[in-house]
A protein has these predicted regions:
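ATP-dependent helicase/translocase motor core
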Residues: 1-195
Length: 197
């Protein structure tokens, strides 16, 4: 039986993890977000704040997005937050927007398995938030084109910003705030290249 054939009561009996497995993940995969370079599930991007209480320290709760969609490993495009079906479609939006702000991501999505709500943080479109059916989730190409339009990149600038980061072979990758700083620097260089040509 397909997700859309289930009754509301049946849908609400599933946990968030089940609903992701049955509905949200297949919808994202069907939009060609299948490769590990484009899609990361349960994406931890902080270790949690260090909390000091007298002589004892412990870590607070780590921040974890349900899904982060990437153009390339260090160019995040979208956050998708899932809630179980007892919630409305948009109930995860505030969390998605908070994470999108932290990760400097232009697109935020929320879903309860019935559809998606998209929030466009670019300010370029006429509609900031809209509902998208499960079978109409945007492809990597569509979101990348919207991102390039938002940034105003020409082909040369796109080549600059998509150039791979240096890899020293250690297996370590930059933290989210380092990725943000690197990407902002590369973006500024790409925009300056247009002036000096």
């Amino acid at each position: 039986m397909e997700w859309n054939e289930l009754s509301k009561k049946e849908k609400q009996s599933f946990s968030e993890a089940d609903m992701c497995r049955i509905s949200i993940t297949p919808s994202i995969h069907s939009a060609y977000w299948a490769s590990l370079t484009h899609l990361r599930e349960h994406y931890y991007f902080t270790d949690g704040n260090i909390e000091v209480n007298g002589n004892k320290t412990k870590r607070g709760k780590a921040k974890k997005a349900d899904y982060v969609l990437f153009h390339k490993p260090n160019i995040p495009l979208a956050i998708v937050e899932a809630k179980d079906n007892t919630h409305s479609i948009g109930d995860g939006m505030q969390q998605a927007l908070d994470y999108a702000e932290i990760l400097d991501v232009p697109f935020a999505y929320s879903s309860n398995g019935d559809a998606f709500i998209e929030h466009d943080r670019t300010g370029k479109g006429d509609i900031i938030e809209k509902e998208i059916s499960l079978d109409k989730f945007p492809t990597p190409e569509i979101l990348w084109d919207r991102y390039k339009t938002h940034k105003g990149y020409n082909e040369e600038q796109e080549n600059i910003v998509t150039y791979d980061y240096y890899d020293d072979g250690s297996g370590r990758s930059p933290r989210y705030y380092q990725v943000n700083a690197i990407n902002r620097t590369i973006d500024a260089i790409a925009k300056l290249s247009l002036i000096h040509i």
